[in-house]
Amino acid sequence: MAGGSFGPTGVAKERAEQYQGKVTSYVIIACLVAAIGGSIFGYDIGISGGVTSMDEFLEEFFHTVYEKKKQAHESNYCKYDNQGLAAFTSSLYLAGLVSTLVASPITRNYGRRASIVCGGISFLIGSGLNAGAVNLAMLLAGRIMLGVGIGFGNQAVPLYLSEVAPTHLRGGLNMMFQLATTIGIFTANMVNYGTQQLKPWGWRLSLGLAAFPALLMTLGGYFLPETPNSLVERGLTERGRRVLVKLRGTENVNAELQDMVDASELANSIKHPFRNILQKRHRPQLVMAICMPMFQILTGINSILFYAPVLFQTMGFGGNASLYSSALTGAVLVLSTFISIGLVDRLGRRALLITGGIQMIICQVIVAVILGVKFGDNQELSKGYSVIVVIFICLFVVAFGWSWGPLGWTIPSEIFPLETRSAGQSITVAVNLLFTFIIAQAFLGLLCAFKFGIFLFFAGWVTVMTIFVYFLLPETKGVPIEEMTLLWSKHWFWKKVLPDATNLEDESKNVSV
């Protein structure tokens, strides 16, 4: 095996240039199948907003909201302010938050495929319950099962993509999860646009169609190859080598395999990964695992994607026009993700996050000004201003789609060493789902209270996160996943936080006892 110098964590420092291989059809197919999990996540994000704007659904389960919607004197910003309706959307993410804690040990001890299959089965059950719901309890039970699927899928799929992708294309291939998510959102918007014509049962079709990608995810999980990292970590080194040879299209995988073996030896010495991740030497990665998903949600994007039809109806768009406008934003999100895939491994992560953040701030401020000046509680926007609002919301979505959308998942999935990778991904998913739940539950109330100021609220957060990236996030482009820890010791701020190299070995031993 190829040699290399070692740091205190036991992982090779200078072996990356010896990695060989190419992008094989085996890698592409594996990534495509795995990324189906993202499409279901996106479908469930996009479908709820359209369904909750359908009169038949509201009359069946949320009659109070249905009556309020029909009252002309009700404030435009407060028509949909109902905690029960918000709970329909947010329950999905609360269930996902709990299930991701269960998914972490399964992903580590039984492999990434096991969690992908568990997620697919949960999605199947949830979509069936939602489609056949006859009361609110059955409806919420279906949403909870979908949330369990999200917890498993979002925990395993980004890890899977990071671990099968070649180092030089890891950013682009890992973004297939976000691309699949955006395709799922767009598909949900188009489905809602069609099913709202099918009265009174169109909403059932919207909710039930999630079963199709769930079936693909479940079946695909059985046939996917396990990642070589996971196999090596579980002691199946020779099997891991065979998979790595297929993935890289070359027999000369010694250098990359040796990095995995070195990392797995350290990983297997760690008995309590969640305790280990709290060590000072993992502080930079832990901060990123918390801040990146938190900031991703605080861009305000999920509020637009969850409630796009509701939001556009609030602005005076008719039922069909609001669904059409939300479908347009979904299409724009898909296209912008393609831009990110093409640029992320050339321009790097930091450039996309900073420029995307600036663009989002400008768009949100402009939308807030237009709504504040031209849109009142009981008025409607003129056609011209409505078009301008839709354009700037689309530009906001474009900025998110090539920056925080994919990179909010990519960066946390690639920065952790193997011994804390599964725990780190669990924290990332848990934080994402926690803040998604909070925003989903609070958004309709915030919209009623802040009115047009809701866009300024999110613009303020985007300003904070852009400054955070500029000062605290090092560039991870082209850095091998098993050598990522070296970045932090060279960063102007994090090198002050990390313990001395001589203390790292002792710290590692202490946590494994």
UniProtKB/Swiss-Prot annotation:
<dbReference type="InterPro" id="IPR003663">
    <property type="entry name" value="Sugar/inositol_transpt"/>
</dbReference>
<dbReference type="GO" id="GO:0012505">
    <property type="term" value="C:endomembrane system"/>
</dbReference>
<keyword id="KW-1133">Transmembrane helix</keyword>
<feature type="transmembrane region" description="Helical; Name=1">
    <location>
        <begin position="27"/>
        <end position="47"/>
    </location>
</feature>
<feature type="transmembrane region" description="Helical; Name=6">
    <location>
        <begin position="205"/>
        <end position="225"/>
    </location>
</feature>
<dbReference type="InterPro" id="IPR044778">
    <property type="entry name" value="MFS_STP/MST-like_plant"/>
</dbReference>
<feature type="transmembrane region" description="Helical; Name=10">
    <location>
        <begin position="387"/>
        <end position="407"/>
    </location>
</feature>
<feature type="transmembrane region" description="Helical; Name=5">
    <location>
        <begin position="171"/>
        <end position="191"/>
    </location>
</feature>
<feature type="transmembrane region" description="Helical; Name=12">
    <location>
        <begin position="452"/>
        <end position="472"/>
    </location>
</feature>
<dbReference type="InterPro" id="IPR020846">
    <property type="entry name" value="MFS_dom"/>
</dbReference>
<dbReference type="GO" id="GO:0090406">
    <property type="term" value="C:pollen tube"/>
</dbReference>
<dbReference type="InterPro" id="IPR045262">
    <property type="entry name" value="STP/PLT_plant"/>
</dbReference>
<keyword id="KW-0813">Transport</keyword>
<feature type="transmembrane region" description="Helical; Name=7">
    <location>
        <begin position="286"/>
        <end position="306"/>
    </location>
</feature>
<keyword id="KW-0762">Sugar transport</keyword>
<feature type="topological domain" description="Cytoplasmic">
    <location>
        <begin position="1"/>
        <end position="26"/>
    </location>
</feature>
<dbReference type="GO" id="GO:0042882">
    <property type="term" value="P:L-arabinose transmembrane transport"/>
</dbReference>
<feature type="transmembrane region" description="Helical; Name=8">
    <location>
        <begin position="324"/>
        <end position="344"/>
    </location>
</feature>
<feature type="transmembrane region" description="Helical; Name=11">
    <location>
        <begin position="427"/>
        <end position="447"/>
    </location>
</feature>
<dbReference type="Pfam" id="PF00083">
    <property type="entry name" value="Sugar_tr"/>
</dbReference>
<dbReference type="InterPro" id="IPR005828">
    <property type="entry name" value="MFS_sugar_transport-like"/>
</dbReference>
<comment type="similarity">
    <text>Belongs to the major facilitator superfamily. Sugar transporter (TC 2.A.1.1) family.</text>
</comment>
<feature type="transmembrane region" description="Helical; Name=2">
    <location>
        <begin position="84"/>
        <end position="104"/>
    </location>
</feature>
<protein>
    <recommendedName>
        <fullName>Sugar transport protein 7</fullName>
    </recommendedName>
</protein>
<feature type="transmembrane region" description="Helical; Name=4">
    <location>
        <begin position="144"/>
        <end position="164"/>
    </location>
</feature>
<keyword id="KW-0812">Transmembrane</keyword>
<keyword id="KW-1003">Cell membrane</keyword>
<dbReference type="GO" id="GO:0042900">
    <property type="term" value="F:arabinose transmembrane transporter activity"/>
</dbReference>
<keyword id="KW-0769">Symport</keyword>
<dbReference type="InterPro" id="IPR036259">
    <property type="entry name" value="MFS_trans_sf"/>
</dbReference>
<dbReference type="InterPro" id="IPR005829">
    <property type="entry name" value="Sugar_transporter_CS"/>
</dbReference>
<dbReference type="GO" id="GO:0005886">
    <property type="term" value="C:plasma membrane"/>
</dbReference>
<feature type="topological domain" description="Cytoplasmic">
    <location>
        <begin position="473"/>
        <end position="513"/>
    </location>
</feature>
<feature type="transmembrane region" description="Helical; Name=9">
    <location>
        <begin position="351"/>
        <end position="371"/>
    </location>
</feature>
<feature type="transmembrane region" description="Helical; Name=3">
    <location>
        <begin position="121"/>
        <end position="141"/>
    </location>
</feature>
<keyword id="KW-0472">Membrane</keyword>
<dbReference type="GO" id="GO:0015293">
    <property type="term" value="F:symporter activity"/>
</dbReference>
<comment type="function">
    <text>Mediates an active uptake of hexoses, probably by sugar/hydrogen symport.</text>
</comment>
